[in-house]
Amino acid sequence: MELDNVKMAHNVYQTCVEEGVRRAVIFSSNHAADYYENLIWSDRMEFVTPDMLPLSDNYYGWAKSTYELLGFAFATGGVNDGKALEVVQLRIGGPRETDLANANPDDLNRVHRSLGAYLSVRDQLQFVVKSVETDDIADENGVPFQVFYGVSANDHNFWSIANARRVIGYDPQDNSQVKFANELAAILQSAKSSQYGD
């Protein structure tokens, strides 16, 4: 199935070039580099940045990283006689309002992940619009290609959004720790009670 999805991504890029589309904005996934989360949760790494080698330990993430790398080949123009396609890859975090409601107080790493991955609706809209409308997305080598993490301005972030702020002016307005303060307090109280008793 994932091989079919990679072929589909190729067809999307190729069709964009053939039809004269200037830019493809692709919803990738944080799973394109999800292997690094193992290092984060074992305290061997603090942040994942979009410029790190995309490493995944599963087929889904592998397919997403393959879309991204294929997009880079199209952005260079190397696969279409010099016809470059601008490509933005959006590694979306957790665009759900329910993750904390389902959190297990005995798994605080999962709670941390839910808080760090959160992407509010209004931040997602801004993120996508700016990815489409920003005039110049060229990287430091002049290639019109970017990978951005899509998360809100969360205190618990473990994916860097610095390049999205710099390149497209992404300015997220929401913070999961503030938005879900009541839910977080209840989870932490439950975890404390479970660990130390009432």
Label the predicted regions.
Residues 32-34, 59, 76, 80-110:
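Flexible, glycine-rich beta-alpha linker
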Residues 3, 37-83:
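Catalytic helix-loop patch of NAD(P)-dependent Rossmann-fold dehydrogenases
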Residues 79, 94-108, 118-144, 153:
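Alpha-helical substrate-binding/gating segment
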